[in-house]
Amino acid sequence: MLGLHVGTLMISLFLCILLEPVEGSLMQPCQPINQTVSLEKEGCPTCLVIQTPICSGHCFTKELVFKSPFSTVYQHVCTYRDVRYETICLPDCSPWVDPHVTYPVALSCDCSLCNMDTSDCTIESLQPDLCMTQRVLADGMW
């Protein structure tokens, strides 16, 4: 009976090793994709919804089975390699508020460590098109 269990375990392990590259290849690679994003600012009653390229996709990563308090785990994420910034003017802002908002436009992406200065590195962040105020579509959207 033990031989049957060990044999089944070995077959399962073999299939996991064999199919691992297939599973990774079925996932979208790290690349720029068009995403609906909301732009808003305190003092402006309107949330402007635009489409812009962001970085999204799968990055291959490994984690040690045996963890040591002396080892550091580095997780690679899909993040900006080359980026350009664009500025847009929000409508109906209060007179004392600068209506301009600057946002990143992904030109190319890379699997690398998350840079907290330019990226949201949280496990679960807000959706990129979430608005706290009234939504308005930017010209040319849909």
From Swiss-Prot:
A single BP term in Gene Ontology: G protein-coupled receptor signaling pathway
PANTHER family: GLYCOPROTEIN HORMONE BETA CHAIN, LUTROPIN SUBUNIT BETA
Domain of life: Eukaryota
Signal peptide: 1-24
GO MF: hormone activity
Positions bearing carbohydrate: 34
Subcellular location: Secreted
Keyword Lipid metabolism: no
Pfam name, any one: Cys_knot
Disulfide bonds: 30-78, 44-93, 47-131, 55-109, 59-111, 114-121
Record note on quaternary structure: Heterodimer of an alpha and a beta chain.
Signal keyword on record: yes
Protein name, per record: Gonadotropin subunit beta-2
Family designation: Belongs to the glycoprotein hormones subunit beta family.
Any GO CC annotation of this UniProt entry: cytoplasm
Keyword entries, A-Z: Disulfide bond, Glycoprotein, Hormone, Secreted, Signal
InterPro entries: Cystine-knot_cytokine, Glyco_hormone_CN, Gonadotropin_bsu, Gonadotropin_bsu_CS
